[in-house]
C-alpha cells in the first residue's frame, strides 16, 4: 500500500531575522551622509506586527524604504512580508509610512491557491488548515509539480514558504 506524502504551504516570517534586518537598517541610516541631521525613525512593533518609517520628506522615506527592503533581502526575507497600510503627514512636515507585517495566508488567497491546485488536475488533495494549506498526494512528483505551480502564481500577496515535507 502506497504511503501518502504531504507538505504545508504557509506564510510564516522569522521575526528574529526581521529584527536583525531592522537593526542593520538603523545602523546603515546612522552612518549615511544623506541622513545626517535629519529626523529618521524606524520602529518595529512585534506584538502589533507593524513597521513604522518616519522621515522629513518623501524622498527620504523612499530611500529609507529601499534600505529596509535591501536588508530584508540580504537576511533571506521576502519583501512581500510588508504590506503598506498608509502614508500620512505628521507634525513639522514629516512623513510617516505604516507597514503591516504579513505572516499568514488570508482566507481568500488560500481559496485562490486551492482552486488553482484543483484546476491543475493533479492527483493531490489541498486542504486549508487555519493559516496553512496542506497538500497531500501519493507521488512526490505531483507534490513537486504543485510547488512549481504555486511559485508561478504571481498575483499572490503573501510570501509563501513550503515546509513540513513528509
From Swiss-Prot:
Superkingdom of the source species: Bacteria
UniProt keyword terms in alphabetical order: Nucleotide-binding
GO cellular component annotations of the record: cytosol
InterPro entries the record matches: DUF520, UPF0234-like_C, UPF0234_N, YajQ-like_sf
GO molecular function, one term: nucleotide binding
Keyword Membrane: no
Protein's job: Nucleotide-binding protein.
Family, per entry: Belongs to the YajQ family.
Protein name as it appears in the record: Nucleotide-binding protein SUN_0226
Naturally occurring in which organism (per UniProt): Sulfurovum sp. (strain NBC37-1)
